[in-house]
């Protein structure tokens, strides 16, 4: 699965299927406000799962795989779930969901990871803003179902922006998996009592060397100096920028300044955190770094985000 609505040939699975004895199955799930509008605060019991219907779509798909994949030559007792980018984070989330126990047996998170879902106090606040922006009261909540999807997305977008302006809530995590402690445990994934029912499976975490390559759209940055990279990073790292660049240059002496810049922007801190958390379950955990650079634009693209697909 991927975490967005994009379509690429790489997601079709044909090439993966050619490489070994596997049955490849891609899935769909609801995204954004359609899949993750938490209305449980205003809708009560009837809307208790509303903040996670996108993840529940994935669980439903995995149940279908469990019940039907043998008809296609697959093994329901040997299911690997794999996702890339936002889909990698979704894989981490699925691996923390009690409902996935027995449905998945291995997991692979590519160029995306997480160790926790969004705080429900925050997501419920966004739900209140959605209702207000739609001009509805709590007793009229069911009318949201009749709003055309395009109109609803616009309503949710406006509500999200107003909530950010009023509450300072990050728009990036507004519409994503919710730690409702019902479908998705609260706290750090794979740890604590609330995660005792989560799947305990081996997992691979992988990122690319140059996830966020600053010179993809600007060839002139190929000639940037190490001092130039330091200056570019000062707004983000302040006085530590110089020591960070020097540390990367020492560890990777064969890399050019622009490559070092890309690698710093592509920090693996969250991946390491997720892998260490998963390791506590006692199953094998592997961390990989994808470095193959496709011969595109005079090799300027390097190992960019999505190239691992």
List where the protein language model places each region.
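Alpha/beta-hydrolase-fold catalytic nucleophile elbow
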Residues: 28, 82, 97, 106-111, ...
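Cap/lid segment of the alpha/beta-hydrolase catalytic domain
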Residues: 1-59, 63-71
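Loop/turn elements at helix/coil->beta-strand transitions in domains of secreted/extracellular proteins
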Residues: 19-25, 75-79, 100-106, 199-202, ...
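Substrate-access "cap/lid" subdomains that shape
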Residues: 67, 101, 110-228, 259-276, ...
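Active-site rim elements
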Residues: 47-52, 113-118, 189-190, 250-265, ...
């Amino acid at each position: 699965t991927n975490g967005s609505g994009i379509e690429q040939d790489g997601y079709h699975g044909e090439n993966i299927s050619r490489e070994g004895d596997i049955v490849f199955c891609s899935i769909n799930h609801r995204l954004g406000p359609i899949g993750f509008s938490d209305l449980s605060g205003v809708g009560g019991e009837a809307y208790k799962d509303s903040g996670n219907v996108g993840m529940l779509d994935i669980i439903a798909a995995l149940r279908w795989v469990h019940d039907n994949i043998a008809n296609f030559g697959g093994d329901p007792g040997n299911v690997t779930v794999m996702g890339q980018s936002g889909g990698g984070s979704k894989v981490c989330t699925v691996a923390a969901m009690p409902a996935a126990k027995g449905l998945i047996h291995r997991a692979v998170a590519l160029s995306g990871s997480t160790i926790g879902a969004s705080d429900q106090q925050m997501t419920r606040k966004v739900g209140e803003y959605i209702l207000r922006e739609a001009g509805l009261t709590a007793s009229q909540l069911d009318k949201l179902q009749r709003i055309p999807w395009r109109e609803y997305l616009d309503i949710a977008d406006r509500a999200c922006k107003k909530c950010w302006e009023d509450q300072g809530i990050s728009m990036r995590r507004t519409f994503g998996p919710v730690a409702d402690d019902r479908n998705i445990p609260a706290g750090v994934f794979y740890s604590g009592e609330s995660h005792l029912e989560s799947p305990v499976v081996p997992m691979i975490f992988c990122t690319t060397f140059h996830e966020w390559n600053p010179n993809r759209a600007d060839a002139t940055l190929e000639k940037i100096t190490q001092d130039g990279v330091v200056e570019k990073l000062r707004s983000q790292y302040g006085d530590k920028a110089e020591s960070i660049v020097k540390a990367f240059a020492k560890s990777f002496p064969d890399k050019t300044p622009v490559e070092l810049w890309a690698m710093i922007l592509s920090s693996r801190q969250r991946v390491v955190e997720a892998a260490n958390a998963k390791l506590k379950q006692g199953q094998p955990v592997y961390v990989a770094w994808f470095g193959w650079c496709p011969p595109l634009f005079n090799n300027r693209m390097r190992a960019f985000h999505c190239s691992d697909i």
